From Swiss-Prot:
Gene3D superfamilies: Arginyl tRNA synthetase N-terminal domain (3.30.1360.70), HUPs (3.40.50.620), Isoleucyl-tRNA Synthetase, Domain 1 (1.10.730.10). HAMAP family: Arg_tRNA_synth. PANTHER family: ARGININE--TRNA LIGASE, CYTOPLASMIC, ARGINYL-TRNA SYNTHETASE. It is an enzyme of class 6 (ligase). This is Arginine--tRNA ligase. It is found in: Cytoplasm. Belongs to the class-I aminoacyl-tRNA synthetase family. It comes from Methylorubrum extorquens (strain CM4 / NCIMB 13688). Monomer. Its main location: cytoplasm. One of its GO terms (biological process) is arginyl-tRNA aminoacylation. Its EC number is 6.1.1.19. A motif ('HIGH' region) lies at residues 130-140.
Length: 585
């Protein structure tokens, strides 16, 4: 039950009534009419901008139009007050029965409460896509958690979602990996090695070298590089991807598809060659020279005639090269082919979750997706800013020793999955995140993950108290739904909790539409806080205690309220991929 959608429909019906009576012209554009929470909760339960956004088109004074619309809305028994504020906003105060119906809906729908049928087709979300050249660091973790939570969020809103990881296994960096692993292989066979500059020095490749020695013995030593390199490269990539998958599993990150870059460039150029043919058929490829970039020239810029894609026709700043001087495909050409492949697999909305250093990538890829899909698909690129590791407010040194750094697994082992996931989502993705290893394990209000999980655990602690105080009573959601008298919930704290529960479907929907899972984290903190505040009031005022052995009526009503609120906390935590414990240990 979404009261915002419900009363938006009611506002539109009222506008239609005004049109039928001749007080509004026909054919008004209602697409910008919304119903949302008022900026100040003391003004009412809902607010609509209808009079403001329609006044100009209707050639009416917004305040006068607001008064006419408010008069029409007052005829609805579910609306106890409709008042015009400021330049024409209409604030609505709802009858208590509306919120009582919300609690009943939350109890009856359980984990499906708030989950919607968001319009739009299949979504493909690509996230993590860390190079398979070493362990994941904390920055990778932020993109991983953000992408996974966004996938959960869109699925909860009703969109079909494919979760994808792009394995960068065709670039020069995997040859560097292979040569580094080969040195560790020689070391495993007893040779003393020196790792030259430009290769990966980390100890994480020692086990790879040992497994190579176990698998191949000394056979690779007798082979020239062009023979051993592809074998070691595949072996090392598989070993790195196994390590990355283990790290992802440790924080609950999952993918449906692991897509290999190498598969794009198969026989005769594979899917990248197909892409160039498709772009040529559209007249979007030409031979030309690019002007020199402004400022300092990048190392890879060449003043020569090149094979170019007309990306500037689709919103990019300049056209882009598709072939290198040696005739091989550019990284950009491979990226376009990959995104075209996602679209051909059925996704009409593509989301890439990348590090903040990929800002220059956004316009060119959005232009490319528009071109290859004839405007049928859109690309949203979500950039995740840096993570600063702190301990009790002091910066943590990221490097442990030469070639080694603080890995994501190090942080998982220290603070656990839930703390990482919640805190990575407690800031907007494009804001730098300070992650304090000491604060995220505190048991206090200042630690959001503890505070929200404690709110959910309280749902079960009051249930245990009720069973002890009123033995033999049935406190299941079905029983509470059947006979709890919700009309006794009149305290401001109870009303606040009901309002917050009623907001959950809208929060879920708006967070999904904006691709912003942090909104769920903020909402959960506010909702858990409302329960904790009411609980604390009951410690001082016995008549407000949730469980009152001498007042069965209020006990059952408050347990119904807490059960509904706890269900919303569990649902929101599931979207974030954070556990909802029944008790805190």
């Amino acid at each position: 039950m979404n009261i915002f959608a419900l009363f938006e429909t009611r506002v539109r019906e009222a506008l239609e009534s005004l049109t039928r009576s001749g007080r509004l012209p026909e054919g008004l554009d209602l697409s910008r009419v919304v119903v949302e929470p008022p900026r100040d909760a003391s003004h009412g339960d809902l607010a609509t901008n209808a009079a403001l956004v329609l006044a100009k088109e209707a050639k009416q004074n917004p305040k006068a139009l607001g008064e006419a619309l408010a008069e029409e809305l007052r005829t609805d028994p579910r609306i106890v007050e409709a008042s015009v504020a400021g330049p024409g906003f209409i604030n609505l105060r709802l009858a208590p029965e509306v919120f009582q119906d919300v609690i009943r809906a939350a109890l009856s729908e359980g984990e499906n409460f708030g989950r919607g049928q968001m319009p739009g087709g299949p979504v493909n979300i690509e996230y993590v896509s860390a190079n398979p050249t070493g362990p994941m660091h904390v920055g990778h973790g932020r993109g991983a958690v953000f992408g996974d939570a966004l996938a959960n969020l869109l699925a909860a809103a009703g969109r079909p979602v494919t979760r994808e990881y792009y394995i960068n296994d065709a670039g020069a960096q995997v040859d560097v990996l292979a040569r580094s692993a080969y040195l560790r292989y020689r070391e495993a066979l007893g040779e003393t090695i020196t790792i030259p500059e430009g290769l990966y020095p980390g100890d994480y490749l020692k086990p790879v070298g040992m497994r190579l020695a176990e698998t191949h013995g000394r056979a690779l030593l007798d082979q020239p590089e062009h023979e051993w390199l592809p074998q070691v490269r595949r072996f090392a990539i598989d070993a790195m991807m196994a390590m990355i998958r283990e790290d992802l599993a440790a924080i609950g990150i999952r993918h449906d598809v692991f897509f290999s870059e190498a598969t794009l460039q198969g026989e005769n150029g594979g899917k990248v060659a197909e892409l160039l043919d498709a772009l040529r058929q559209k007249g979007l490829v030409y031979e030309g020279r690019l002007p020199p970039p402004k400022g300092q020239l990048p190392d890879d810029w060449e003043d020569r005639e090149q094979t170019l894609f007309r990306s500037s026709q689709f919103g990019d700043d300049v056209d882009r090269a598709l072939l290198k001087s040696d005739g091989s495909f550019t990284y950009f050409a491979s990226d376009i082919a990959y995104h075209r492949d996602k679209w051909l697999r059925g996704a009409n909305e593509l989301i890439d979750v990348l590090g903040a250093d990929h800002g220059g990538y956004v316009k060119r890829m959005q232009a490319a997706v528009k071109a290859v899909s004839d405007g049928q698909a859109r690309l949203d690129v979500k950039l995740c800013q840096l993570v600063r590791l702190l301990r009790a407010g002091e910066p943590v040194k990221m490097s442990k020793r030469a070639g080694e750094f603080v890995t994501l697994r190090d942080v998982i082992d220290e603070v656990g999955r839930d703390a990482i996931r919640f805190m990575m989502l407690y800031r907007k993705n494009d804001a730098t995140l300070d992650f304090d290893l000491a604060k995220v394990v505190e048991q206090s209000k200042d630690n959001p993950v503890f505070y929200v999980q404690y709110g959910h655990a309280r749902r079960f602690s009051v249930l245990r108290q009720a069973r002890e105080a009123l033995p033999g009573e049935d406190f299941s959601p079905a029983a509470l739904l059947a006979d709890a008298d919700l009309s006794v919930l009149t305290d401001p704290g109870e009303i606040e909790m009901m309002r917050l529960i009623a907001q959950y479907p809208r929060v879920l929907e708006s967070a999904a539409a904006a691709h912003e899972p942090h909104r769920i984290a903020f909402y959960l903190y506010e909702t858990a806080s409302s329960l904790h505040s009411f609980w604390n009031k009951g410690k001082d005022l016995p008549q407000l205690r949730i469980v009152n052995p001498t007042d069965r009526n209020s006990t059952r009503a408050r347990l119904a309220l807490v059960e509904a609120l706890g269900g919303v906390l569990a649902s929101g935590l599931a979207v974030l991929g954070v556990s909802a414990p029944n008790e805190m240990r």
